[in-house]
UniProtKB/Swiss-Prot annotation:
Membrane-spanning intervals of the chain: none
Record's protein name: Ribonuclease HII
Gene: rnhB
A GO term from the CC aspect: ribonuclease H2 complex
Location in the cell: Cytoplasm
Cofactor or coenzyme needed: Mn(2+); Mg(2+)
EC number assigned by the record: 3.1.26.4
Keywords of the record: Cytoplasm, Endonuclease, Hydrolase, Manganese, Metal-binding, Nuclease
Function: Endonuclease that specifically degrades the RNA of RNA-DNA hybrids.
GO biological process terms on file: DNA replication, removal of RNA primer; mismatch repair
NCBIfam families for the chain: PRK00015.1-3
Family membership noted in the UniProt record: Belongs to the RNase HII family.
Catalytic activity line of the entry: Endonucleolytic cleavage to 5'-phosphomonoester
Organism of origin: Chlorobaculum tepidum (strain ATCC 49652 / DSM 12025 / NBRC 103806 / TLS)
Length: 205
């Protein structure tokens, strides 16, 4: 079970500690989505939060349940979404940084400290931060952000599946599965595909 033990030393002197994570760096289609989550100072998770973990390790049903609990319990939360066209224009790393910063800037108030999943971050606002490799499986606030980012992105891709039914976005959410690669080979790419993400299997360079 993830606890808020990582946040507690920060809460001794700060009240606005924010967890940040993203979803959708690797897919061939769709946006990259980041979430920023601030829990109340000295928050102690109970109940369904005992099941919180890196969103990739959770079932879709549990992610949805946790997302609801996170939104209800958080002091504030926000999302940042960067579309495929922008990803192609500025590259996926820059797009991920942009999504994270958009999420932070969309919070109701400016956090005092950021806990960021991964090993790099480029803040727009002058806020102190710490990057944590595999933070979504170590830090409560980051895991919560990973769930919000993943569930929102999945919802966006499911909506896109209705517009582009031939690709099966509601199943693989844009990731490079065999079914998705086959659909691209048969139909070409659609408007939400990342043109800069090339497939060697299809001879793309």
């Amino acid at each position: 079970m993830l606890s808020t033990d990582f946040e507690y030393p920060l809460w001794e002197s700060l009240s606005q500690v924010c967890g940040i994570d993203e979803a959708g760096r690797g897919p061939l289609a769709g946006p990259v989505v980041a979430a920023a989550v601030v829990f109340p100072r000295h928050f102690r998770p109970t109940g369904i939060f005992a099941k919180l973990d890196d969103s990739k390790k959770l079932t879709a049903e549990l992610r949805d349940e946790l997302a609801l609990a996170i939104r209800e319990s958080a002091e504030s939360w926000a999302l940042g979404v960067v579309d495929a066209e922008t990803i192609d224009r500025i590259n996926i790393l820059q797009a991920t940084m942009l999504a994270m910063n958009l999420a932070v800037e969309s919070l109701g108030s400016t956090p005092e400290f950021l806990l960021v999943d991964g090993n790099r971050f480029r803040p727009v606002l002058p806020i102190p931060y710490q990057t944590i490799v595999k933070g979504d499986s170590k830090v409560f606030s980051i895991a919560a952000a990973s769930v919000l980012a993943k569930t929102h992105r999945d919802e966006l891709m499911t909506t896109s599946a209705a517009e582009y039914p031939e690709y099966g976005f509601e199943v693989h959410f844009g990731y490079p599965t065999a079914r998705h690669v086959e659909a691209i080979a048969r139909h070409g790419r659609c408007a939400i595909h990342r043109q800069s993400f090339k497939l060697r299997k299809l001879g793309e360079k």
